[in-house]
Amino acid sequence: MSERTPIVTIDGPSGVGKGTISQLLAQHLGWHLLDSGAIYRVLALAAIHHDVELENEEAITLLAAHLDVQFLSDADGKGIKVILEGEDVTSSIRSQECSNAASKVAALPRVREALLRRQRAFSTAPGLIADGRDMGTVVFPKAAAKIFLIASAQERAQRRYNQLQDKGFDVNIDRLLAEIIERDERDTNRAASPLKPADDALVIDTSGIGINEVFERVLEHVKASIS
């Protein structure tokens, strides 16, 4: 990781708009994008494909060390295509099953350590937008700018419901809400890299705010931080 490469971290729980803001920011600045959550989703999917128990820390860590994954820009430059063992899994890793599995493997300390170096390798010129949950606290603690997005569990469940409905998934919003609350509890209280804003992070509540307004606030903070 080059100390000269400017890095912006965007952390927060699921459903707060991290992915959208990160992609907009990376596109606006012409920087690289790291979707760290995708790494854990890919690992979780690999574990499922290879019939590895999600609680088997030793096996998951070994799988992480040999994870064959690539992150490629879409043709339109607005997103990331995720390739696992030569297969495009961009859509597969966004399923609710994979999301829940990713949260479980991310709670394993040795697994997080195994993927730490891989994440830091994404820091290359001209700059990096790192989207995740512990980017500003653990992976890139010296980042030039740190953002932490939040939103109510109810609003995040509604956003996730709409997103999955648009993709043709049959989902229950009450179940989504329960899963979000459960995941928040697990992520916030885990021993390894608990979900929390860095001391020097700008915290933005996206509840009831349009994505354009959130983006403008983030961009203003980033420009002030890297100038």
UniProtKB/Swiss-Prot annotation:
It is found in: Cytoplasm. This is Cytidylate kinase. The gene is cmk. GO terms for cellular component: cytosol. Keywords: ATP-binding, Cytoplasm, Kinase, Nucleotide-binding, Transferase. GO terms for biological process: nucleobase-containing small molecule interconversion; pyrimidine nucleotide metabolic process. HAMAP family: Cytidyl_kinase_type1. InterPro entries: Cytidylate_kin, Cytidylate_kinase_dom, P-loop_NTPase.
